[in-house]
Amino acid sequence: MSVPAIAPRRKRLADGLSVTQKVFVRSRNGGATKIVREHYLRSDIPCLSRSCTKCPQIVVPDAQNELPKFILSDSPLELSAPIGKHYVVLDTNVVLQAIDLLENPNCFFDVIVPQIVLDEVRNKSYPVYTRLRTLCRDSDDHKRFIVFHNEFSEHTFVERLPNETINDRNDRAIRKTCQWYSEHLKPYDINVVLVTNDRLNREAATKEVESNIITKSLVQYIELLPNADDIRDSIPQMDSFDKDLERDTFSDFTFPEYYSTARVMGGLKNGVLYQGNIQISEYNFLEGSVSLPRFSKPVLIVGQKNLNRAFNGDQVIVELLPQSEWKAPSSIVLDSEHFDVNDNPDIEAGDDDDNNESSSNTTVISDKQRRLLAKDAMIAQRSKKIQPTAKVVYIQRRSWRQYVGQLAPSSVDPQSSSTQNVFVILMDKCLPKVRIRTRRAAELLDKRIVISIDSWPTTHKYPLGHFVRDLGTIESAQAETEALLLEHDVEYRPFSKKVLECLPAEGHDWKAPTKLDDPEAVSKDPLLTKRKDLRDKLICSIDPPGCVDIDDALHAKKLPNGNWEVGVHIADVTHFVKPGTALDAEGAARGTSVYLVDKRIDMLPMLLGTDLCSLKPYVDRFAFSVIWELDDSANIVNVNFMKSVIRSREAFSYEQAQLRIDDKTQNDELTMGMRALLKLSVKLKQKRLEAGALNLASPEVKVHMDSETSDPNEVEIKKLLATNSLVEEFMLLANISVARKIYDAFPQTAMLRRHAAPPSTNFEILNEMLNTRKNMSISLESSKALADSLDRCVDPEDPYFNTLVRIMSTRCMMAAQYFYSGAYSYPDFRHYGLAVDIYTHFTSPIRRYCDVVAHRQLAGAIGYEPLSLTHRDKNKMDMICRNINRKHRNAQFAGRASIEYYVGQVMRNNESTETGYVIKVFNNGIVVLVPKFGVEGLIRLDNLTEDPNSAAFDEVEYKLTFVPTNSDKPRDVYVFDKVEVQVRSVMDPITSKRKAELLLK
């Protein structure tokens, strides 16, 4: 704790002012330490207005010797008097509450963000801070956002007064900035408008002596805009806006209040409260779980009151419930979009899920749902699989973002053109519906829309949000693709001008020098002489058909001593992407390229990814090469790393390469090298498997598009050839070799990838299923034991069963993650799935930022060029790793969602009967995987029988017994059963999502 001890003192320096402040900091032992802080002020910080004639004369270059750009327009937006032509100054709360509005391309132009606002936003919400920084950094001739460093300007810096709170001082600093701008721009007839929702701040601005500041609340300012009708729906629902609604409606639904910060801190310290991230069940939106180190199994959070307004992914504080209330995981399926469909958005009445007393104002839970919940509660209490349960008592950090959804038709009055309260059903089925207010309800009924969440008061059953924009008509390819990109936080906007300015000026005409010692080329690139000329090597690339961003190429050559020279050559992306540039920052932010069925979202601009970096055949390209000497048993004799220049001889698809290798009439040197690579790759794979590497599976399919219409027309299971394994083995070998090299050179900050061993509890249910149904089990003593036990899971009557077990095992594994070497001890570096002690990603720098960092570290390790300080700093490496882990995971989910959408489109007119496998059994349905389409779907009990009440669920045998429709004989369905299902594509009438519907034959 610190308190001002002596009032701040200013003194004049040769080039400006400095402010000296002395404070006393209380120490742990009760003493006090005096600290003197000196704060330097400048007189040359410009206003950045193009109208200004004074500031261009005083401005000085920055550390990169560049002058700041004057961005604010000389003819800004003009509104009615007294505002006229004006710039906007924002306060912190407006930024925090209305960042969506600030990003709207149709409002808020020429905006001044005081530095103190930027600092406060950073302290309160880092995600919003990042979006605000992006607005300011990428500001162009359209939006024109700037940061004004008011804290370092002698004209705008204010000292904290005695007994003044920090918040009041910061508000005064914002007003001082407005006042200075108003006076500074007076000769140019440009006013300044302070937009703040703080009434006291607005009143203070008008009362201050000689103040000519114009102040408006956010709503007041929006109402003055010429396009107010179009953007009014995007105004966030804050408490002050919602008072009329609360007066006019009745609510008896109340969530528990969150614990105070002091109580939370004390509870965490005393061990009675726990912190973790909550994951909502994908099959039951009323059940979540939190993994805590103290417990071997996740702690369950069951019911609306216990979930207490937590969103999927929130960091929460939980308190354990008494052991008498511990339960087993739910055995029923509950979707949020089909639950409480009769709720009235104008009447926030609700159920207390503990006493089930419903309000007379609305039907919240149907009798059928109530019976289902009661039945599930009985099973959960009697089950032998009881787990600890808890309740959420505090939200440490919200995971709120922009969400995609559609209006619930039952909540909309299509005849009304006035403002309505309506529900939005979100695409993520783990999330509750959200109430928004809009005048465009009828217009938006068939649209995919984007919303943001503003708050979730205790008296509201559902969170409150606001409309951001519509993406287009439901089921249009453009709207659905943009929706899934937004849902998975994939950056898909075009690259900014600043990023594109980092690309080579020659564009597509750029060429690698013919000679590496050419004086003119060396003068432009002094490092050129350190490259190895490998253009004489017979190098080729092997990739999926149609690949244009070719990251890697290979070669093999017989050595005089009988060994093999094998080279892996990776695109030298870091030659073009330099640390500290806008291009590097954009690549780091995106983290990875994202591959959808119909498009690719690049991590780097297309000029690099598909041309200058791509190892295309017949042209010279810069590469980073790893060259081994291998013996006939594929043992490494030695390895060398080098920056190089190569010329690929051919670009093969996997199938083309396989045909070339298998064609016995082809005996040229390139083909012989490919055969050698295949032979060595088989030995490499065998050694990996013997060491315990896992051979897992996933239901991957490929969607074929019509060449003329670009519509999806066929789905097939991906076929793997020997050449797929050839490439994979040498990429793995390169990644392992590079990992060892960079760890030796940078033991604290090497960019690596680890895969933790799964805890036995992850396989508990799968092992119970296998033991009960097949008398089999999976061993987790080691990765080798796991691999061997998977090999033994074979059903002689069904060849696919082993693949099914591998698919289900994949879902029990831990996720691999990027990390820097200083974060873990060496034994924890191990990659469990690959059975290697150290691993990284090096071979795909065009599409993965991890590989870019690994390239830079390898260049530093071999003495090619010094390593950037960014990649030597643990804190910065930690931030990079956190981001690329999140982006990598989101990219995978986005790719799967794209396949799921297009598979649904293929099946629209192709209803068929297919073979499926039961992978889950619930109290009210079964989940079936259809390998042909790579989809899994829930078959609800309602679609299995006309009498759901007579069905019986056996949790021990993983069996559901029911009397099928049009039959009088009971049928038993077990997990792992092979079944015939009718597959068709249907659109859910509530969510407007097209999905595969399965019906049991």
Swiss-Prot record:
Residues 343-363 are annotated as: Disordered. The keyword Nucleotide-binding does not apply. Its cofactor is Mg(2+). Residues 422-489 form the CSD2 domain. Residues 1-235 are annotated as: Endoribonuclease. Residues 343-356 have a biased composition (Acidic residues). It comes from the Eukaryota. The keyword Transcription regulation does not apply. Residues 531-861 form the RNB domain. GO terms for molecular function: 3'-5'-RNA exonuclease activity; endonuclease activity; RNA endonuclease activity; tRNA binding. Keywords: Cytoplasm, Endonuclease, Exonuclease, Exosome, Hydrolase, Mitochondrion, Nuclease, Nucleus, RNA-binding, rRNA processing. Signal peptide: none annotated. SUPFAM superfamilies: Nucleic acid-binding proteins, PIN domain-like. Its EC number is 3.1.13.-, 3.1.26.-. Component of the RNA exosome complex. Specifically part of the catalytically inactive RNA exosome core complex (Exo-9) which associate with the catalytic subunits RRP6 and DIS3 in cytoplasmic- and nuclear-specific RNA exosome complex forms. Exo-9 is formed by a hexameric base ring of RNase PH domain-containing subunits and a cap ring consisting of CSL4, RRP4 and RRP40; DIS3 associates with the base ring of Exo-9. Interacts with GSP1. Present with 606 molecules/cell in log phase SD medium. Belongs to the RNR ribonuclease family. Catalytic component of the RNA exosome complex which has 3'->5' exoribonuclease activity and participates in a multitude of cellular RNA processing and degradation events. In the nucleus, the RNA exosome complex is involved in proper maturation of stable RNA species such as rRNA, snRNA and snoRNA, in the elimination of RNA processing by-products and non-coding 'pervasive' transcripts, such as antisense RNA species and cryptic unstable transcripts (CUTs), and of mRNAs with processing defects, thereby limiting or excluding their export to the cytoplasm. This is Exosome complex exonuclease DIS3. It comes from Saccharomyces cerevisiae (strain ATCC 204508 / S288c) (Baker's yeast). The lineage of its organism: Eukaryota, Fungi, Dikarya, Ascomycota, Saccharomycotina. The gene is DIS3.
